[in-house]
């Protein structure tokens, strides 16, 4: 009779996953600091990246070193932002955001993932028009809906979405209003469980059977690439068992 993974094996897998997540956060901190300076109070993108690091139990020392490398105080690698677009099986649109120090390597890895899973890469803008860029501040169930809604709208949010199935609430903002809305809500004692600027599809596409399997395989393969920061798609997540 076969045996399941050992405790050590599961720990190693967990450590590897955590290490990969830390690498992505450090790259985001590096690019944000290089673009907007090393002071998070004057750099909303850097503050968001650092908040993500803190919520993942990354030490402040690690983040500070990443900032210093980006601002030239310490020697470090320079990363650039690149975005790729394409289609997964079933006509599912996919956006892949990367931070890389080697574009040739990154595009080859991304193209290989699309090709191996039955998809294809497109040109710039080929699928981006199917998505909206927006800020999302997520709150767990239990927060007072009226209080949050009033504070969010007053702070400049575009919309407040309540999910009746679990009571969670999302506050939606324009990207350039994200920082001011977040700061206003935090100042009012309304701390989001998660906050980010992201892409959301205008409409979801349902897939099933082998197509769903291939779409999931592609998304997982892309997310596992070292240079990939975020992967967005317009697939109906319920179809993938998410």
Curated annotation (Swiss-Prot):
Any one GO molecular-function label of the UniProt entry: DNA binding
Q: What is this protein called?
A: Probable transcriptional regulatory protein XCV3282
| GO BP | regulation of DNA-templated transcription
Regarding protein family, the annotation reads: Belongs to the TACO1 family.
Taxonomic path: Bacteria, Pseudomonadati, Pseudomonadota, Gammaproteobacteria, Lysobacterales
Q: Name one GO cellular component term.
A: cytosol
Name its species.
Xanthomonas euvesicatoria pv. vesicatoria (strain 85-10) (Xanthomonas campestris pv. vesicatoria)
Q: Which UniProt keywords apply?
A: Cytoplasm, DNA-binding, Transcription, Transcription regulation
UniProt main location, coarse: cytoplasm
UniProt-listed SUPFAM superfamilies? YebC-like (SSF75625)
* Annotated compartments: Cytoplasm
Asked whether the UniProt record includes Zinc among its keywords, one would answer no
